[in-house]
Amino acid sequence: MSVPGEREQGAGEDPATVRPTQRTLVIIPTYNERENLPLIVGRVHHACPQVHILVVDDGSPDGTGALADELALADPDRVHVMHRTSKAGLGAAYLAGFDWGLRRGYSVLVEMDADGSHAPEELSRLLDAVDAGADLAIGSRYVPGGTVRNWPWRRLVLSKTANTYSRFLLGVGIHDITAGYRAYRREVLEKIDLSAVDSKGYCFQIDLTWRAINNGFSVVEVPITFTERELGVSKMSGSNIREAMFKVAEWGIRGRLDRARGVVR
């Protein structure tokens, strides 16, 4: 029986040299992404044919879930679908995907947007960083070599302000802590108490990064090009921003108190 996501090994291959990223699951949450989903799935497998994909659909009324089923039927070994009955937020979708992937033995779990803003052609950069020893590889817009395309200046200012705000309050050195294109070793997700993570929106990324750092895992930023979606509608909302502001402030205060008491979360 083959291990999920693992390429066939030659008879003379030393198991000690098998890379963790040979067992990779790319998790793609969807809500009304019917136009984008076939394109992104095709691009992922063109760039990295060995990886598996899990589409986590939150009951999209536009038929995204049914389309995902068609893609899985056409490629049952590499494409899988999880159907959820309601839109419970980005964080909840990823947590469900992590649980699914960990229970099936994947060694590396990747977060990727369905709208094309995270280029599948750059996925190998994240996987190479994990193979080189990173516990969490973040696709960063704000390190040398990283860039953003086609964003309104207000979105860019908001993003950079959120990252500066988070770095200051949490005391971490990550330039793009809000980034949603990232690859985790399974050990990170197993060590973090995922049942305690209740972030629903985009601050989910800040939450998990902060927890990974506090648990002693290595975090590496890899430059990527982030491109604003061309099809569909952005899911960013005022409630996402408010959640991030209040939670980051809470975590920052709690983190200082925890460090004073020697507590690790």
UniProtKB/Swiss-Prot annotation:
Its main location: cytoplasm. Disruption phenotype: Essential it cannot be deleted. In depletion experiments increasing amounts of phosphatidyl-myo-inositol (PI) and decreasing amounts of acylated PI mannosides (AcPIM), as well as decreased synthesis of lipomannan (LM) but not lipoarabinomannan (LAM) are observed. It comes from the Bacteria. It is found in: Cytoplasm. GO terms for biological process: glycolipid biosynthetic process. It holds the Pfam family Glycos_transf_2. Interacts with Lnt (also called Ppm2, AC A0QZ13) upon coexpression in E.coli, which increases the PPM synthase activity of this protein. This is Polyprenol monophosphomannose synthase. It comes from Mycolicibacterium smegmatis (strain ATCC 700084 / mc(2)155) (Mycobacterium smegmatis). The lineage of its organism: Bacteria, Bacillati, Actinomycetota, Actinomycetes, Mycobacteriales. The gene is ppm1.
